[in-house]
Amino acid sequence: MLDQNEPTLTRRRLLQMGLAAGTAGALNLLGGSAADAATVKTPAAKPKATADSVIVIWLPGGVAQTDTWDPKKFTPYVQGMKGGDILGTCPSIPTSADGIRLGAGLENIASVMDKGTILRSLTNKTKFGAIHLKAQYYMMTGYLFPAGVEAPSMGAVVSRTLGRRDPNIPAYIDIGRDINTSNEEFLFINEFMGPGFYGIKHAPFMIPEPAQGLPTLKAVAGMDMTRLDRRQHYLEAITGLSAPALQTAHPVKDYVKVMEDARAMMDSPVKRAFLFAEEEKPETLKAYDVGHRFGFGCLLARRLVESGARFIQVEYQYEPFGGFDMHADGQSRMKAMKAQIDRPVAQLIRDLDQRGLLERTLVIVMSEFGRTIANQPAAGTEAFGFAERSTGSDLVIQNEKMYGFHGHFSSGNCMLFFGGGFKKGFVYGKTADAHPLLPIENPVRLEDVHATIYKALGIPADTNYVTEQRPFYVTNNGKGVPIDALLA
């Protein structure tokens, strides 16, 4: 309501009132108030950090583990063979680590396995463990969807708990995800890869197309930096006024801080990280260039770590029934997908190691689940008609499109870890050599994996922040236990 005793309603005052009202409305829609702002509680003793930075190589869609990180006996295609006879659709190859083998087509990653650890027994026995988006949410947050509270992703946890390594670089950066979309699935992904209830300050800084650099670090054409600074001062003046609703509204202050940080980046050395086309050697560019933005995303991640980034997530864009989401023709499609990731991931590890950065940088390769011979194909494909979530053992493989691992399998997932205090040339966990390929040694819970990652970063597994008058832990209910066997 306007104050009738105020003789002049200035433009500045009008903007102030509108911003304050909008903030109050947003808080009501979120079901909270400024007083609900999360506050930290004292966790257990802080472990000694062995990593300063994290790079997550995110391969959504469900990577077939038996053709990649946990190869089984190669069973060549024969028309009429039974599904239960298929354990692997490619030969295995030796690696630089004694006794460790990978699926053929990963020769470059195989050459750096003496620097990494493979976890082969990650299990997900939750009700929705084999549903893409819910499994992705679980992998990234450690909580089931819906969690009652919008859970923060790992990147947001690291951002809030550790903050920035360099004041000019956001603590949480995402490379390669499409953000200009109206697709409901992708919009959901953008939500759960975000800050959750931590707020906009801990949202990822998005870089959709690494090869195009970051146009937002450049002033709008025709606008000099003086004019841009003047606009920034106007914004600060608006938000610095005395309306109580505005002064106590954390979301508004956080949005303003994000804009201030973006302006600061325009004058910072971090811009050089995007100049890889001009600064890198031709042979380096060739190693990362696989005809997909994922490759240059790995290169940009390395350059950002060199510049002082804290947490970077490089994504191979999720595409239902595309990419790693294979419901038919799995053998040939998997071969093509391995070619997309093999060189860039291996080159990233080599570059970090040669520059002395791998020791304090943790690189994680992960997907939401693995694959099994059971078939869940897309309607309209040649393979359509297989019993959903069947064991697949009695399926008759009638053509090559049916030859491959097409079913969602959450009970035997794999992860890779390089650097950051993890062991080198090491395998943890073992799965059976016969269907259904379940873990038979050292089955692992996701909350324990998260606890191990956080321990490497010096974050206790029971770190928590209060929201809605209750603690919310960085591992599921604070029950994560670090797997010390993975750590050097």
Q: How would you describe each model-predicted region?
A:
Residues 1-488:
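Ligand-binding pockets and gating/stacking loops
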